């Protein structure tokens, strides 16, 4: 019975984490934020009206 419980337990590998133990959701949020900043900088150079002033 103990072997069945161990086999059915969630695996550590099933958790969404990078090799540095950072949750992937946080990693994706950081990437999205960085890309948005780059897009805003590019947009500001072309069309100043689309700049975000945060």
UniProtKB/Swiss-Prot annotation:
Gene Ontology cellular-component terms for this entry are:
extracellular region
Q: Which residues form the signal peptide?
A: 1-14
What does the similarity note say?
Answer: Belongs to the conotoxin T superfamily.
Secreted found in the keyword field = yes
Residues recorded as bearing 4-carboxyglutamate in the entry: 52
What's the protein here called? Conotoxin mr5.4b
Q: Where in the cell is it found?
A: Secreted
- Keywords, ordered alphabetically: Cleavage on pair of basic residues, Disulfide bond, Gamma-carboxyglutamic acid, Secreted, Signal, Toxin
Quote the InterPro entries the UniProt record gives: T-conotoxin (IPR031565)
Q: Known post-translational modifications? A: Contains 2 disulfide bonds that can be either 'C1-C3, C2-C4' or 'C1-C4, C2-C3', since these disulfide connectivities have been observed for conotoxins with cysteine framework V (for examples, see AC P0DQQ7 and AC P81755).
One Pfam family this sequence matches: Chi-conotoxin
Name a GO molecular-function annotation.
Answer: toxin activity
- Free-text note on domains in this protein's UniProt record: The cysteine framework is V (CC-CC).
Q: Which residues form a coiled coil?
A: none
Entry comment describing in which tissues the protein is expressed? Expressed by the venom duct.
Q: Which residues get removed as pro-piece? A: 15-40
């Amino acid at each position: 019975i103990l072997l069945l419980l161990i086999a059915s337990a969630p695996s550590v590998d099933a958790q969404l984490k990078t090799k540095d133990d950072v949750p992937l959701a946080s990693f994706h949020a950081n990437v999205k934020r960085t890309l948005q900043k780059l897009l805003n900088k590019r947009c500001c150079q072309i069309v100043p009206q689309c700049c975000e002033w945060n």
